[in-house]
């Protein structure tokens, strides 16, 4: 007890003695009161000691707890912390441990926060992939017993894997969205409605939510894109079919190009493939309806136009046949066409296709006949010149000095040269015709007559004419010989001299019947031999420039 406290207690005791003296308190009472004071002081001391003892125990417990917590934190954090434990009082020991504990607690809070954020992100991405709604309260709880850096690294690696998967899925979703958008423009349907049918988070009105990347969303997208591509393919095939129908009908009815240009967008699709990039709206239902309406309109005009085209093609076929001297019964063919069209038994397209086939065959046959027909034309021309020369040589005034006489003389000279080539022409024609008939197994008809038979007939007729000419020349020779003998025997009689070049026996000349000539007949003939009889005609003495054959 300090001196000041002792002095205070003594003075108080002295004051108490004085009071007791004044009161007249007995010594027994005084002793009793003093004992009570001592007891009360002792109780107070005891209380103080007990309180101090408890405080010491509390400090010891705090120190032990701090040390235990440090050990637990080091285990949870996976870190080892070295610190020097002081040998001093409990308070000094606690003050040395407290900073270490606080540092570890800060690390724990930081690590727990990092783990919690990582786990929440993992839970969020996992929920997105699973297609579940995510809230922060549904995140995973942090395991307080494992707050190590290794655990954090593992979770972060898992998070990165999930982020990569999310990025891949998001890329797929964006790719699907682009595909749906492209198809929506081609097919002209509501893009937002299509996306909303997959998931509401995909529309532009759901900007507050991330796009769904769940398996269900990807599966729905796959089915949607597949169905849209199938629809695109179906519409493309339909429009291509309508386009081909329009092309056929336009060509059939010779529709002007101005009318066709309205449907260039359909015609441009004829060579397109299902995977090709197409123009916006080119496969819309409105485009298909317009094409269907046009095909219906063209089909309604087709019947009347087809009749006109059928007869036009028939005329073309007949013209080809006539121009190439091929056999065709025009009247019977037209009558048959009229009956077939009016009865309705035959499809006009089939009829037209049949006629087109006949035209193609006729053109092919005409091409194969061209060389022969060209030679037939030359042969006919020679025959015509032969006929003209016959008529010319019968004209007694052909040598008169009239206008154009010199032209006729030149023509006659050329005609004799051309006529001399007729036998060779007939030989070549016969060879060509036989080769043609052997190759095709059918007779070569020219104006409905077998050309080979016509050529053979011409050979016979020409031989007959040559024989008649020979007999005529022999008769003339005998007549001339008889006249010479008479003149030698009886002398010449004065007679009026006939004009130069005039035949002495004009009235006795045997003429070839024109009716037996074939220059104007449908057929043509070839003679394999024989000379031209023109050289045996009576020629005036002064016509020395003209060709003569004996």
Curated annotation (Swiss-Prot):
GO terms for molecular function: microtubule binding. Keywords: Cell cycle, Cell division, Cell junction, Coiled coil, Cytoplasm, Cytoskeleton, Microtubule, Mitosis, Nucleus. One of its GO terms (cellular component) is spindle. Pfam families: MAP65_ASE1 (PF03999). Residues 46-174, 288-310 form a coiled coil. Induction: Expressed throughout the cell cycle. Residues 471-531 are annotated as: Disordered. InterPro entries: MAP65_Ase1_PRC1. One of its GO terms (biological process) is microtubule cytoskeleton organization. The record marks 401, 412 as: Microtubule binding. It is found in: Nucleus; Cytoplasm; Cytoplasm, Cytoskeleton, Spindle; Cytoplasm, Cytoskeleton, Phragmoplast. Belongs to the MAP65/ASE1 family. Microtubule-associated protein that bundle and stabilize adjacent microtubules (MT) of the cell cortex. Confers MT resistance to the drug oryzalin. Promotes the formation of a planar network of antiparallel microtubules. This is 65-kDa microtubule-associated protein 5. It comes from Arabidopsis thaliana. The gene is MAP65-5.
């Amino acid at each position: 007890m300090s001196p000041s406290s002792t002095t205070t207690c003594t003075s108080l005791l002295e004051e108490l003695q004085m009071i007791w003296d004044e009161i007249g308190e007995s010594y027994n009472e005084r002793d009793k009161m003093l004992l009570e004071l001592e007891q009360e002081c002792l109780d107070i001391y005891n209380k103080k000691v007990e309180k101090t003892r408890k405080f010491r125990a509390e400090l010891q417990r705090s120190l032990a707890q701090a040390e235990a917590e440090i050990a637990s934190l080091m285990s949870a954090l996976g870190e080892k912390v070295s610190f020097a434990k002081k040998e001093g009082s409990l308070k000094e020991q606690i003050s040395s441990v407290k900073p270490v504990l606080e540092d570890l607690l800060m690390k724990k809070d930081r690590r727990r926060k990092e783990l919690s954020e990582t786990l929440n992100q993992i839970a969020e991405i996992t929920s997105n992939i699973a297609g579940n709604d995510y809230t922060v309260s549904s995140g995973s709880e942090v395991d307080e017993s494992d707050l190590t850096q290794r655990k954090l690294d593992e979770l972060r690696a898992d998070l990165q894997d999930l982020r990569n998967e999310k990025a891949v899925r998001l890329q797929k979703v964006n790719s699907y969205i682009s595909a749906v958008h492209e198809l929506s423009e081609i097919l002209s349907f509501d893009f937002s409605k299509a996306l909303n049918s997959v998931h509401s988070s995909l529309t532009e009105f759901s900007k507050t939510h991330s796009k769904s990347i769940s398996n269900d969303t990807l599966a729905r997208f796959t089915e949607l894109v597949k169905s849209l591509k199938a629809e695109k393919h179906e519409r493309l095939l339909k429009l291509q079919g309508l386009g081909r129908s329009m092309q056929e009908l336009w060509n059939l009815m010779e529709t002007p190009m101005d009318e066709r240009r309205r449907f260039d967008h359909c015609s441009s699709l004829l060579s397109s493939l299902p995977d090709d990039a197409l123009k916006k709206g080119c496969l819309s239902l409105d485009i298909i309806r317009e094409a269907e309406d046009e095909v219906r309109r063209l089909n309604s005009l087709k019947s009347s136009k087809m009749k006109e085209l059928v007869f036009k093609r028939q005329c073309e076929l007949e013209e080809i046949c006539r121009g190439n001297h091929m056999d065709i019964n025009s009247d019977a063919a037209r009558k048959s066409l009229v009956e077939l069209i009016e009865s309705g038994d035959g499809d006009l397209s089939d009829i037209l296709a049949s006629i087109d086939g006949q035209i193609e065959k006729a053109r092919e046959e005409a091409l194969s006949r061209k060389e022969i027909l060209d030679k037939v034309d030359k042969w006919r021309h020679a025959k015509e010149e032969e006929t003209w020369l016959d008529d010319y040589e019968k004209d007694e005034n052909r040598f008169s000095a009239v206008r154009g006489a010199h032209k006729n003389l030149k023509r006659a000279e050329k005609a004799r040269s051309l006529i001399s080539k007729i036998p060779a022409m007939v030989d070549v024609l016969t060879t060509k015709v036989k080769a043609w008939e052997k190759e095709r197994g059918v007779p070569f008809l020219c104006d409905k007559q077998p050309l080979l038979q016509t050529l053979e007939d011409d050979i016979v007729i020409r031989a007959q004419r040559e024989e008649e000419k020979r007999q005529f020349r022999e008769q003339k020779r005998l007549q001339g010989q008889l006249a010479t003998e008479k003149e030698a025997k009886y002398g010449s009689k004065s007679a009026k001299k006939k004009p130069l070049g005039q035949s002495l026996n004009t009235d006795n000349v045997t003429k070839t019947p024109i009716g037996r000539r074939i220059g104007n007949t449908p057929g043509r003939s070839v003679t394999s031999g024989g000379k031209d009889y023109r050289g045996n005609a009576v020629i005036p003495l002064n016509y020395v420039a003209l060709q003569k054959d004996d």
